[in-house]
Curated annotation (Swiss-Prot):
Signal peptide: none annotated. This is Adenylosuccinate synthetase. One of its GO terms (biological process) is 'de novo' AMP biosynthetic process. Keywords: Cytoplasm, GTP-binding, Ligase, Magnesium, Metal-binding, Nucleotide-binding, Purine biosynthesis. Pathway: Purine metabolism; AMP biosynthesis via de novo pathway; AMP from IMP: step 1/2. The keyword Magnesium applies. GO terms for molecular function: adenylosuccinate synthase activity; GTP binding; magnesium ion binding. IMP binds at D13, E14, G15, K16, N38, A39, G40, H41, T129, R143, Q224, T239, R303. Homodimer. Belongs to the adenylosuccinate synthetase family.
Amino acid sequence: MSNIVIVGAQWGDEGKGKIADTLAEKADLVVRYQGGNNAGHTLVVNGKKTFLHLIPSGVLHQHTKCVIGHGVVLDPVALDEEITRLQAKGIAISAENLFVSESCTIITSYHKLLDAVRESNTSEKIGTTGKGIGPAYEDKVSRKGIKFKHLFDKDLLRSRLAISLAEKETLFRDLYKVEYPTLEQEFDKLFALGQKLKQYAADTFSIIDKAIAAGKNVVYEGAQGVLLDVDYGTYPFVTSSNTSVAGVYSGATTAGHGFDHVIGITKAYTTRVGEGPFPTELFDDVGKFIQHKGGEIGVTTGRIRRCGWLDLPLLKYSAKCSNLTSIALTKVDVLSDMDTLKVCIGYKYEGKEIYCAYPGIDLYKVEPILVEMEPFSIDETVTKDNMPAALKTYLETIENHVGIPISSLAYGPSREQILFFEDYFKKG
């Protein structure tokens, strides 16, 4: 039995879905524990792409059960559409392999509308996906939320909707002056979706607990990345949930279950979608080259990702925040055959040199300390035994600065293009 957590170690989009899909081959459960359909995971199998937003990456493996934990904010419209889209591709999804926590907080039309009008009416853009994630978490924390199980009870759903709409109605009508669905319109839509999706509702807490007790392999699949964590991230340019390993405990399982591996997924360079500080961002042709070669366009938003050199002070910070045991390095092939290759090993900040970021640091004011690395060249024939010396040096530089080993290396989009230096499912 192995308990494995997959955490994004940057600002999201690191390739978590690819690693989760690969590990799912040996997993009994793959669990989503936070976020919502603002996540976007791309899986490539036999040259065919599959895009996932809510459903865990284990869905492509028939023996693997997929769990959406109670820490996820659930858009029932998005879930229904994703199930329908995947089933149309011949991917089996049923109440036998998909389990959705009855306690997931529901995203309504009101949340999505509020998300959109706030972003368009503020001078400080956060770069929200507009999926209603933040407003749904607000309702959850303020105890105005609607749970998945509430969709199955007409009286309860109507009363919870009335509570949720009470304040928002004033905002829509008097402040933002926008049209919004009536309570009855929203009720009719959500109740109908509830009847359709009820088959997937489950006590996921007990499902996970029993799987661990039975010695099953469980993989927890994070969304976004540590640097977007509402507490640890680059606030206010963050998401609304705990994207660090702490999110597993609050969103899926109990603190009584330890983890055998906490794998930090990171690209061989750095990307960011939306607003916020980015110390190593490249504004020149090199940045454009990485963006083009890496296909850096958001799966969820369609926005072009900002690109820059690998930032080791931030990676070390992420490792500390989530107690990472190792790094899974992705998209190494994007850096192949570059004329110039650099990595950030530290910052100059307030008259000092620092080598690990921390919560109070102002990343707008740091000056990255960049070192030149020898460029390397790899192709699909790369193995652990024929790896170029320059690439080995690049990997060793990362390990030495962050203080944990690199346990796998991805050098292409498909699940076959990964070198594993460690068996995550092997004890000891």
